[in-house]
Amino acid sequence: MKFIKRLLVFSLICIILGVTTIFGFYFYVKSDLPDVATLRDVQLQTPMQVFSQDGKLIAQFGEKRRIPLKLEEMPKELIEAVIATEDSRYYEHYGFDPIGITRAAFAVLASGSASQGASTITQQLARNFFLSNEKKVMRKVKEIFIAIHIEQLLSKQEILELYLNKIYLGYRSYGVGAAAQAYFGKEVKDLTLGEIALIAGLPKAPSTMNPIYSVERATNRRNVVLQRMLDEKYITKAEYDAARAEPVLPKYHGAEIELNAPYVAEIARAWMVERYGEEAAYTSGMNVYTTVDSKLQRAANQAAINNLLAYDERHGYRGAEKELWQVNQPAWSSTQLSEYLSNEPTYGDMFPAAVLSVEEKSAQVWVKSYGVQTIAWEDMNWARRFINDDRQGPLPKSANEFLAAGQQIWVRPRTQDGAITAWKLTQVPNANTAFVAMNPENGAVTALVGGFNFVHNKFNRATQSVRQVGSSIKPFIYSAALNKGLTLATLINDAPINQWDESQGTAWRPKNSPPTYTGPTRLRIGLAQSKNVMAVRVLREVGLDETREYLTRFGFKLDQLPRSETIALGAGSLTPVQMAQGFSVFANNGYFVEPFYISRVENPFGNIEFSAEPKVVCHRECSSELDEFAEQDAASPYAPKVISEQNAFLTREMLYSNIWGGGEWSSDTGWNGTGWRAQALKRRDIGGKTGTTNDSKDAWYNGYAPGIVGVAWVGFDDHSRNLGKTAPNRNIEDDVSGAESGGKTALPAWVEFMSLALQDVPVQQKAVPNNIARVRIDRDTGLLTNKLDSSSMFEYFEAGTEPTEYVSEHVNESIYSTSSGEELF
C-alpha cells in the first residue's frame, strides 16, 4: 500500500509539475506568440502573371512560384500521401501529438531513419507562417502553442488547404500546384500516383530530395511515401507496385509560357511596379491582361525574325561563334558536348551546335537538346564570306570552305506541320529589328517585337529606340499639303534642287533615290514613289513652321522635328510606336489615339483592380454626346479628331498607290510605288509607305490593313553603321540584292506579318466619305478631260477643290513651283 501511495503522490507531483511547466512556458512565451487569427485573411505570396488579351500566359514574375488551389481541387491520393507521411494521426490530435512524437522516435530507433514526421502538419504550418527554422527549445515550445491556437481557429480542412499551398517544395516552388508544374509540367489533377508520392515526400528535404538534385534520393523518398500509404491502407499492393515501377525523370518545367512576348511582359512588369510597388506587384498574385493578341504576336515574331535573319544571311557568313577543339585534337565526348551546350543560350528557335564532321556537301553537328543532326548542302550553301556590310565573297563550292570540326555554330530547324524536318546553318545577327501592330480604333498595341531576342538584349527598340524616320515622314507632310489646298492631281516639279545655304556657305542638293526625275508630276505619284525633291517643294508650299506645327497633330513633338527643310527627307527621329500612332490617324479617318499595353488587372479572386479606358474612335455622329460631356464638365471617352475624314481618305489613296501604283502597263502608263512588294498580299484594302534614311542606316515600312496598323524597322544599334548592299546570291530563295532600303529590308517583314494576320479577314470595300468628288482628269496635267482613252483617269478630290480647267486650256504656269529659296537650277 505504501508503494502505491508513494506512486500516486509521485504521479500527482509529476502532473502538477508538468502542468505548471506547461503553464509556465505558456506565460513565458505568451507575449511573443503571434495572432493566429491573421490566418483567416492570409494572402499567400503568389507571383504576378502576364497574359495576352485572349488569356495566353506570357510571363510570370516573383521569387516564389505558387499556384493556389482549393482542397477540393487536389487529388484525394495527394492528401492521403501527405497525411500518411507527415502526420498519420492528423484527424485525431489537436495540433500537438505526443503519441505521434513517441511513435516517430521508436521508428527512428528501429530503422535508423525517420520515415514519419515528428512535427504535426499544424506545427509545420505554424513554423512556416510564424517562426524561423532554427532548432531551439523555445522555438519548439512556441510552435506547439501556436499549433494548438490554429486548431482552435481553423478546421482540419482549412489547415490542410493552407499547408498544401504554403509548404516549400524546392526549385522556388511553394505549394503542391507549383511543384506539380516544376517537376512534371502538369496540373495536380493529372499527376500519377508515383508523382503524387514524390511531391508528398518533398517537405522533409525539398532542396536535396527533389528529382532534379538527385534522382536516387527522390526515388528512395518516393518509395518511403508509397510504403506509408500502403501501411495506412490508402493504396493496394498492386497500386504500390505500379507506382514504384514509374521512372523518375530529372527535368525542370518552368511556368508554361504559351506566348513569346517578352518585351511586352517587361512593359507590364515595369507598369505594375510603378503602380503598385515592387512587393505588391511580385507577391499579390495579380493577373495582368495586356492588349496583345496571340495570333498577331506570333505573326509579328515570325515575320520580324525571319526578315532580320534573311537580311543577315544575304550579307554573308561571319564564321563560327568559337572553336571548341582544333581539327588535330581529340573530339569532345557526348557528355562534354551535352554539358557545354546546355549552358549556352537558345535564342528563340536558334540553337547552339558543335560541328562533329564536315563532308563536301554536308556536315554532322551536335545540337543542344537534339543531339546528333545533319545539315544538308541546300541548308548552308548561302554562306558566302562576309567581308564588310557592302561586300561579300564568292559563293561557296564546299562546306569545308566555312565549317570545320570543333566549331560552335548556330542552327535553326526547318519544320513542317510542327515536326522538324531539317536543320539550317544560321548566325546571330549584328543588325536588329522592331515591329509594332496597333489597333487604330483605340490605340491598343496588339503585337510588339522589341528586338532580335530578349535574352540576347533587353533593350526595347519598339518603344525606346529613337531613329531617323526617312521617307516615312512624307505622308504627314503631304497631309499638311492637302490641308493647305493642294490635291492629289496638283503638279509638283520633280527636278533637281540646288540651293545656296548662306549659313553654311554651301549648296544644298537633295536628290531622288534613284536619282531620276520626271518633271511636273502629280502629288499622288510623288508620295507613292517617294520622290525627295517633290517632298521638299511640297514642304515649301505649306511652309516649314506651319508643317512642323501640323505634324504635332499626330503626336510628334516639335523637338523631334528639325526646323529645316531636311524634315522633308526624314531627318526627324521617332520610335516605331510613335510611327504606328501617327499612321493610325490615317487608318481611322482622322482621330488621334494613344497607344496602350495593359487592358486590365485582376486580383487572385478575379476582381478587377484596373481596367483601361482608352479614348476610342467614334465613327457615328457623336456631337450631341460630346456636348453632353462638356455640359457635365466630364472627360470625353472619344478620341479627338485631328484631321478631316476627307484628308485621311485622300492620304490613304496615296498610301494605296505606294503599293499598287497606277496607270495601265498595256498602254505604257503603268507605274509602281516603292512598296510594290506588298502586292503579293493580293489585297486592295491596304496601303503604306517605305522609309529609308540617308546612307541606309534605318529601313522602315509603315502601313495599314483593316483594323491593323503595322510598322517594321531594321537597323543597327550602332547609329553610325549603315545597312549596306549585297551582290546577288542564287543560293538564297527570294534573294534581294543591291542597296538596302525600306522596300527591300523592312517591307518583307510587314508583308509576312500581314499575310498571317489577315488570314480569314475578308477584303473591305473602299468607303468613300461625304464631300469627296470623283472626276476624270488628264494623267499628265491633272486637269479635267473629256477623253476616255489611257491618257485619262478618275481621281478623288475634296469637294470644291477639283480642277475647273480642261486639258485643252492648260498652260505651263499651272504647274506648282516655289519662290521660297534661291534655286540655282
UniProtKB/Swiss-Prot annotation:
It comes from the Bacteria. It catalyses: [GlcNAc-(1->4)-Mur2Ac(oyl-L-Ala-gamma-D-Glu-L-Lys-D-Ala-D-Ala)](n)-di-trans,octa-cis-undecaprenyl diphosphate + beta-D-GlcNAc-(1->4)-Mur2Ac(oyl-L-Ala-gamma-D-Glu-L-Lys-D-Ala-D-Ala)-di-trans,octa-cis-undecaprenyl diphosphate = [GlcNAc-(1->4)-Mur2Ac(oyl-L-Ala-gamma-D-Glu-L-Lys-D-Ala-D-Ala)](n+1)-di-trans,octa-cis-undecaprenyl diphosphate + di-trans,octa-cis-undecaprenyl diphosphate + H(+); Preferential cleavage: (Ac)2-L-Lys-D-Ala-|-D-Ala. Also transpeptidation of peptidyl-alanyl moieties that are N-acyl substituents of D-alanine. Gene3D superfamilies: Biosynthetic peptidoglycan transglycosylase-like, DD-peptidase/beta-lactamase superfamily. In the N-terminal section; belongs to the glycosyltransferase 51 family. In the C-terminal section; belongs to the transpeptidase family. One of its GO terms (molecular function) is peptidoglycan glycosyltransferase activity. InterPro entries: Beta-lactam/transpept-like (IPR012338), Glyco_trans_51 (IPR001264), Glycosyltr_51/Transpeptidase (IPR050396), Lysozyme-like_dom_sf (IPR023346), PBP_transglycosylase (IPR036950), PCB_OB (IPR031376), PCN-bd_Tpept (IPR001460). The lineage of its organism: Bacteria, Pseudomonadati, Pseudomonadota, Gammaproteobacteria, Vibrionales. The chain crosses the membrane at residues 7-27. Pfam families: PCB_OB, Transgly, Transpeptidase. Its EC number is 2.4.99.28, 3.4.16.4. This is Penicillin-binding protein 1A. The active site is at 86 (proton donor), 471 (acyl-ester intermediate). Residues 413-752 are annotated as: Transpeptidase. Residues 1-6 are cytoplasmic. It is found in: Cell inner membrane. One of its GO terms (biological process) is regulation of cell shape. It is a single-pass type II membrane protein. GO terms for cellular component: outer membrane-bounded periplasmic space; plasma membrane. The keyword ATP-binding does not apply. Residues 48-216 are annotated as: Transglycosylase. Residues 28-825 are periplasmic. SUPFAM superfamilies: beta-lactamase/transpeptidase-like (SSF56601), Lysozyme-like (SSF53955). Keywords: Antibiotic resistance, Carboxypeptidase, Cell inner membrane, Cell membrane, Cell shape, Cell wall biogenesis/degradation, Glycosyltransferase, Hydrolase, Membrane, Multifunctional enzyme, Peptidoglycan synthesis, Protease, Signal-anchor, Transferase, Transmembrane, Transmembrane helix. The keyword Transferase applies. Cell wall formation. Synthesis of cross-linked peptidoglycan from the lipid intermediates. The enzyme has a penicillin-insensitive transglycosylase N-terminal domain (formation of linear glycan strands) and a penicillin-sensitive transpeptidase C-terminal domain (cross-linking of the peptide subunits). Pathway: Cell wall biogenesis; peptidoglycan biosynthesis.
